[in-house]
């Protein structure tokens, strides 16, 4: 079988290239990479690159904050150069000679006229009101000019001119262009709030909040708190409708000139979190023709910057969820590789972790009714400047390891998701602080070594006899619930199941999390009854979703905490009813991912979650051939006394610290 096609994208500043070179440094850049990527998103950074576009009649220098992000001085290779509009147009032409797609991207932050008189200084009404950063920090793409013109109706026509004149192949909507920042702290500006008041009905907001407040960050903050606590659903719906309208216009404008669009998912890690906290319902974007969804799965850089917990499990499950709910977009995974401005470099400071995280992110699967497919259509290197030839070679090795095989079947079980559960989940979350659905398989993978890396939809769940894990069973429609309960193979339900109409012969774990909230883990089709109750000191106070949630990048959303004992008991119960794990020591910080291709070859990824070398005690049959597919270890591996080992097995086979080993296993027969 041919390998599933995958795309390789690079997001980079102009610092990756050389405007003084005859070909703008394109050949040297490609030679350094050692491959030709599918596409490059050219980070021109300043939104004024579009808003203050001067055309192509004359040559002129581009703003310093176009030539380098925020106008910073240099990267490892060169100082910021003085690019002109003609230079950049030439760069696009040179990249096209290699059949590379070239998209353009900008950010929303302003620099207070540091390098030029900015559009926002001429139109202060488009500033994004933010209770953390103040009013004069960024441009709001959902704003309105004082004459009533929507910002998007200025930006998109100018974007069309920029894309056509420079020869770009599309627009990459980066951070802040959908979704924006967290609804609990933006947009609190007069312009946006007054439009919301019209949408809501002016009489519903107290008169004090209909007064201008742009002069006072304290007044803006108080007004936003009131809206968040009293009109959260309406606030989120209004904001989402604005984003969907903007993206609908952008898609039409780009497609009309035979160009494409890519949308970022910064900050918002899942469908539900985006609906509730960021005011963008991705489900409404699925049908408007967006070509690419760039999932900002920056697990390595987040873990390095913020610590606390592993993010690879959450982000991996999120990618699977996004693929299932948004089937009409290509899903591109974005690992955070390095960034001069944000001051991190996973290639040099955490290469093992980067290798592991890219593999885990891109190798989530979706079952389509006949077989499993890789959920990711490709990956994007962020950012792609200042990388040495040796580092590019390592990135190519990671790609070959991660995309080098096709999946026919994946994991210990599948998990179920559907667009229909997110509306009732909003109400459930407000009442109980319910954990979003993608976090259930993530927690079980992280803490119980259950490989739940394949997702499916209700219409396909009867086409497999693999065990099926159903988080939030209680939120499905009666029709889908009936379909789930009628399955013949092992089915694992989680959620509030008191009145779910479950059969009597089930195995069940229960844990009371609140006065009127008991969480169940119920196993169907096991043949006998078993019940275990996990004691819990649940809080006396009801869950409160209203406090401002600020640390959306570094923390998970507020939720009712579930005792580890519940997941331990659930994991033990599930494992006792499925095949035993070949990994004998998950307690040593090791997890596994297993895949099967169409030739019956088993692919095994062993992932470390410790900062030291770890030995994975992994059972392999003696009558098989084992082939190492990861860069490390450097010597062959084989079976010694039934366990994976080095050929010279006097020394143990080490997993790299927070790294990965990938092997495939072929039966000799």
Regions found by a protein language model. Give the residues of each.
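Aromatic-lined carbohydrate-recognition surfaces of secreted/lumenal glycan-active proteins
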Residues: 4-15, 101-111, 172-176, 233-276, ...
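The substrate-binding groove and active-site-proximal loops of carbohydrate-active enzymes
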Residues: 8-21, 65-85, 136-153, 227-244, ...
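Active-site-adjacent "subsite" loops/lids of carbohydrate-active enzymes
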Residues: 10, 15-17, 81-86, 90, ...
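Catalytic domains of carbohydrate-active enzymes, especially glycoside hydrolases
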Residues: 24-65, 161-170, 288-293, 362-372, ...
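Aromatic-lined carbohydrate-binding/catalytic grooves of carbohydrate-active enzymes
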Residues: 34-83, 110-120, 180-190, 194-233, ...
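Hydrophobic targeting/anchoring helices
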Residues: 46, 55, 180-183, 262-433, ...
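Carbohydrate-binding surface patches
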Residues: 411-412, 417-436, 472-478, 482, ...
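Helical hinge/lid and interdomain linker segments adjacent to catalytic or ligand-binding clefts
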Residues: 431-516, 520, 647-656, 668
């Amino acid at each position: 079988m041919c390998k599933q096609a995958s795309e390789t994208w690079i997001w980079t500043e102009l610092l990756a290239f050389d405007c003084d070179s005859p070909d703008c440094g394109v050949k040297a850049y490609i030679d350094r990479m050692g491959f030709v990527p599918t596409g490059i998103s050219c980070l021109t950074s300043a939104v004024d690159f579009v808003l203050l576009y001067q055309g192509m009649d004359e040559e002129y220098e581009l703003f310093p904050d176009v030539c380098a992000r925020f106008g910073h001085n240099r990267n490892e290779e060169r100082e910021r150069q003085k690019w002109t509009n003609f230079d950049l147009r030439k760069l696009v032409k040179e990249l096209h000679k290699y059949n590379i797609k070239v998209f353009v991207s900008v950010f929303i932050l302003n620099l207070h006229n540091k390098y030029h008189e900015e559009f926002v200084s001429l139109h202060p009404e488009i500033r994004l009101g933010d209770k953390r950063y103040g009013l004069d920090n960024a441009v709001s793409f959902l704003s309105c000019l004082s004459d009533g013109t929507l910002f998007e109706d200025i930006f998109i026509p100018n974007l069309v001119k920029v894309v056509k004149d420079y020869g770009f192949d599309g627009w990459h909507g980066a951070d802040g262009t959908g979704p924006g920042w967290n609804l609990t702290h933006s947009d609190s500006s007069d312009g946006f709030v007054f439009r919301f008041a019209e949408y809501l009905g002016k009489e519903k907001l107290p008169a004090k909040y209909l007064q201008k407040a742009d002069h006072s960050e304290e007044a803006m903050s108080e007004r936003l708190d009131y809206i968040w606590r009293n009109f959260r659903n309406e606030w989120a719906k209004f904001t989402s409708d604005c984003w969907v309208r903007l993206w609908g216009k952008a898609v039409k404008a780009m497609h009309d000139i035979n160009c494409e669009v890519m949308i970022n998912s910064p900050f918002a890690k899942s469908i539900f979190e985006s609906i509730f906290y960021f005011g963008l319902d991705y489900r409404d974007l699925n049908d408007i023709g967006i070509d690419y969804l760039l999932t900002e799965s920056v697990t390595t850089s987040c873990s390095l910057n913020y610590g606390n917990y592993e993010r690879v499990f959450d982000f991996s499950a999120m990618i699977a969820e996004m693929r299932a709910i948004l089937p009409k977009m290509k899903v591109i995974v974005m690992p955070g590789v390095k960034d001069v401005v944000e001051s991190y470099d996973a290639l040099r400071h955490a290469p093992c972790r980067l290798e592991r995280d890219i593999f885990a992110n891109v190798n989530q699967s979706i079952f389509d009714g006949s077989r499993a497919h890789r959920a990711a259509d490709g990956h994007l290197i962020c950012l792609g400047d200042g990388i040495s030839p040796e580092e590019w070679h390592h990135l190519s090795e990671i790609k070959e390891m991660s995309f080098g095989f096709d999946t026919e079947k994946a994991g210990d079980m599948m998990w179920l998701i559907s667009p229909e559960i997110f509306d009732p989940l909003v109400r459930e979350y407000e009442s109980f602080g319910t954990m979003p659905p993608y976090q259930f398989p993530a927690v079980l993978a992280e803490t119980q070594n259950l490989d739940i890396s394949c997702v499916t939809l209700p219409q396909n769940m009867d086409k497999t006899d693999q065990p099926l894990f159903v988080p939030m069973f209680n939120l499905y429609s009666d029709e889908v619930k009936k379909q789930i309960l009628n399955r013949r193979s092992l089915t694992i339900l989680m959620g509030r199941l008191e009145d779910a109409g479950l059969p009597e012969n089930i195995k069940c774990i229960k844990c009371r999390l609140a006065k009127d909230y008991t969480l169940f883990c119920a196993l169907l089709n096991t043949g006998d009854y078993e019940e275990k109750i996990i004691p819990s000191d649940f809080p006396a106070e009801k869950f409160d979703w209203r406090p401002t949630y600020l640390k959306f990048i570094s923390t998970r959303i507020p939720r009712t905490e579930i005792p580890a004992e519940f997941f331990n008991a659930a994991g033990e119960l599930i494992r006792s009813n499925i095949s035993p794990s070949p990994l004998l020591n998950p307690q040593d910080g090791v997890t596994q991912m297993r895949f099967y291709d169409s030739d019956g070859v088993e692919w095994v990824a062993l992932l470390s979650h410790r900062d030291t070398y770890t030995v994975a005690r992994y059972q392999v049959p003696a009558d098989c051939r084992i082939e190492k597919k990861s860069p490390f270890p450097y010597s062959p591996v084989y079976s010694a006394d039934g366990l994976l080992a080095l050929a010279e097995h006097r020394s143990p086979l080490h997993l790299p610290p927070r790294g990965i080993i990938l092997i495939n296993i072929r039966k000799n027969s």
